[in-house]
Amino acid sequence: MSDQVKTNHKTTAKERPFARAIQTLRNVGLRPTRQRMALAKILFDGANRHVTADSLHEEIDKANITISRATIYNTLHQFTDVGLLREVVVDSGRTYFDTNVTDHHHYFLEEEGCLQDIPDGALTIGLLPEVPPGKKFSRVEVIIHVAKDS
């Protein structure tokens, strides 16, 4: 009887489509609101990716989900603050959010306007300047801008 009860009460990810998003948010101390769950599901239920607030807003619209740009922007920054995303500033007018939060570097493909991860081990950083007194390096981040070869 107990085996039958266990079998009947099992839940799977297919039965609970937001289970992973809810757990991800709770693990970092964020309340799983409807907007956060929708954004977490889109951002984290798949391969690592780079998004902007605008590209995410377009994706949300195509999925017939109503979330304001301001809420998307605020949520991206909340996710960054708790370590779920990494903010990558390409220039003063272009910020991307990366779901891969490990230390790694990027190509910025200028023609396409997108980021691409540089494979591990493809970039070696040699001599670094001295750190100001009382400071230490926290991270070295390289973004290589790539233009069309004409």
Predicted regions, residues:
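Amphipathic alpha-helical interaction segments
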Residues: 38-41, 55, 74
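Short capping segments at the starts of secondary-structure elements
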Residues: 46-51
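Basic amphipathic alpha-helical segments that dock to polyanions
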Residues: 72-82
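DNA-recognition alpha helix
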Residues: 52-64
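Non-DNA-binding regulatory cores of transcription-related proteins
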Residues: 82-150
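Intrinsically disordered, low-complexity serine/threonine- and proline-rich regulatory segments
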Residues: 1-45
